[in-house]
């Protein structure tokens, strides 16, 4: 069962959901993008994204149809109106109140709901990893272990924190990492007391 199908089971015939955060859009579709909306009802789903991502999304996403995002103000209400839904759930954990208020007015949805119930359902789903996610975790762990072993042999007198951080990043990306979860922290000497220190020329 796909993650979208699992989400559908948390909805009822009177309720739909808008997934707008990049991290959850990717979780449900497998497709990374900086723009888009995943619209979900109990019996229908569509991923809307703009022309920059459209071709790649159509090739990559297999769990639901993909449509071009041209006019969100029109397309999103139309989708839910077609299914005769007025109660629409929005994410709250990853949505600023000001953004929710703008979206509520912008999309003209009769009963928008941002009470945490959608986030609770998604978080409970994400807490239980599927086989693909477990493989990704194992792969990331292996990359990190190999990178640490490699960088120990790279560090020597005269090599700066910045050089070490760049070498570490390059090794991980060259050996299977898609991207960095956060900026690599490489600090030494007196900088070692900084848990979120920025690599320097030291």
Language-model features and meaning:
Residues 33-37, 62-64, 104-106, 202:
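Short, solvent-exposed amphipathic alpha-helical segments in soluble enzyme
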């Amino acid at each position: 069962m796909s993650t979208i199908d699992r989400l559908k089971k948390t909805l009822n015939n009177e309720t739909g959901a808008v997934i707008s955060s990049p991290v959850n859009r990717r979780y449900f579709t497998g497709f990374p993008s900086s723009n888009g909306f995943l619209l979900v009802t109990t019996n229908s789903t569509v991923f809307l994204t703009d022309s920059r991502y459209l071709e790649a999304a159509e090739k990559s996403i297999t769990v639901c149809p993909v449509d071009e995002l041209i006019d969100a103000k029109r397309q999103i209400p139309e989708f839910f109106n077609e299914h005769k839904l007025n109660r629409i759930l929005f994410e709250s954990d990853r949505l600023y109140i000001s953004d929710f208020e703008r979206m509520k007015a912008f999309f003209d949805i009769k009963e928008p709901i941002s009470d945490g119930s959608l986030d609770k359902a998604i978080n409970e789903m994400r807490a239980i990893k599927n086989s693909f996610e477990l493989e990704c975790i194992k792969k990331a762990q292996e990359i990190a272990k190999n990178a640490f072993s490699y960088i120990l042999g790279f560090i020597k007198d005269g090599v700066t924190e910045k050089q070490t951080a760049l070498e570490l990043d390059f090794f991980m990306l060259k050996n299977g990492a898609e991207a960095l979860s956060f900026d690599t922290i490489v600090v030494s000497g007196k900088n070692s007391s900084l848990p979120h220190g920025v690599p320097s020329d030291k």
